[in-house]
Amino acid sequence: MPSPAPLSAPRSPISREADAFVRTKIVATMGPASRTEEAIRGLVEAGVDVFRLNMAHGSIPEHEETLGRIRSVSAELERPVAVLVDLAGPKIRLGELPDGLVECVEGAEITFVRGEESDRADRFVTNYPPLVDELAVGDAVMIADGTVSLVVESKTSDEARCRVVQPGPIRSRQGVNLPGVKLSVPAMSQTDWQHAEWAAAAGADFVSLSFVRSPVEVTLLEQLLRTRGSRARVIAKIEKREAVDNLEAIVEAAGGVMVARGDLGVETDVASMPMVQKRIIRVCQQFQKPVIVATQ
């Protein structure tokens, strides 16, 4: 009588966790210090699966050179790695401030005005001309990743007067978030369209769309990529309240999703951020779409 086959030992929790990690990929953002072949090789050997090219910084020739090095190292090490081209999108930023820095004191009045620059510390300009038109009394204005907050107290056709609620220092070109304010700005600027066309021609594997608000925006980018012969997946970055409200439709339309915790944490209540993140991940699992959790 043959002896029974030996029972396999139960898999340890460590083994199960290791398998789960293999299914979890690492996305690394390229920067000036990591663009050399030596640095890229070290990152690939350390386990990077996807390299992100941030189109908000650098020129197309610089990114093209970096992408070429990534492909070269990938072939040399015989390890496939993907490239994600991240479009900048309509990020609202402050213009130039006097001396580059302003200390916002609690209770102080700050006025947003039209124009490209200001010579007064209490008068701010931005790169978004319709801002004054689209703000309303009572709206919150968050600056520098939400570390400084203002509230709109009054407005005219040419300016919006705000009161500092949460004080702190701000610098030129820092980001401005308007939680709950519906903006008329398109999802992609002319520069974004040019970058998307370059991504298609360069053979990018993923193209991410910033500040998505509706599935229509995702579809438009996908159509552009397909007409250029690209099979790149569109990654919808969830960082606006409107995107959370339209989450299921956006996830269904996209090739994948990024939980962009930085801007999303400012646009939503920070205390609810963990639950919002879990909801996004759960919906992506329901639609069997990859999901990236990124930034602070």
Summary of predicted features, one role per range:
Residues 1-295:
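Non-catalytic helical/linker scaffolds that mediate oligomerization, partner binding
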